[in-house]
Curated annotation (Swiss-Prot):
Site, as annotated: May have an important role in the acetylation of the polyamine: 142
List of residues binding acetyl-CoA: 92-94, 99-104, 131, 136, 140
Pfam families xrefs: Acetyltransf_1
Enzyme class: transferase
Domain N-acetyltransferase: 3-160
GO function terms (MF aspect): diamine N-acetyltransferase activity
UniProt-annotated catalytic positions: 138
InterPro entries: Acyl_CoA_acyltransferase (IPR016181), GNAT_dom (IPR000182), MshD_Acetyltransferase (IPR050276)
CDD domains found in the cross-reference section: NAT_SF
Protein name in UniProt: Spermidine N(1)-acetyltransferase
Length: 161
């Protein structure tokens, strides 16, 4: 299986929402109710919201939105918001059957290459305390817990200039 990483396009919108739904249900089962997950998906992954973020990413503005594709099918994505020399990792999700296959790491490394070219010195993210898979992934990839915010760990990774 070959994996292609590229910026998401408008044509990826429907599949992006489905990947998000599958991933959220798998990641947060036992943490949040199914009703809460569906409500979150409707609010945070609405077509209008994602379309705006895809367009901003294509225009190289303040959003970097990359997809991982297996045989031309979207299987995961990463989204970062960039402000000056800092980035916030907003989302990194994979279809459940593609976890633990180094695809998340490939997405993160590709995003980090782009961040370095943009002069990003630090990346921050929030991960739910009970999301042990996510926490372990970020920790193994160089992120350290810097603080907490409610039910989330705030993790950061510093980069050389």
């Amino acid at each position: 299986m070959s994996i292609e990483i590229r910026k998401l396009s408008i044509e990826d919108l429907e599949t992006l929402i489905e990947v998000a739904r599958e991933s959220w249900k798998w990641t947060y089962a036992g943490i949040y109710s199914e009703e809460y997950i569906e409500s979150w998906i409707r609010e945070k992954y609405s077509k209008e919201k994602l379309l705006n973020e895809i367009v901003r990413s294509q225009s190289n503005l303040d959003i970097l939105f990359l997809g991982a594709f297996a045989d031309s099918t979207l299987i995961g994505f990463i989204e970062l918001k960039i402000i000056a020399n800092k980035a916030e990792l907003l989302r990194l999700y994979l279809k459940p059957e593609y976890t633990h296959k180094k695809i998340g790491k490939t997405l993160l490394l590709e995003a980090e290459k782009i961040m370095k070219k943009k002069g990003i010195l630090e990346c921050r993210l929030y991960v739910h305390r009970q999301n042990s898979v996510g926490f372990s992934f970020y920790y193994k990839n160089g992120f350290k817990v810097e603080d907490t915010d409610g039910s989330d760990f705030i993790m950061e990774k510093k980069y050389e200039s």
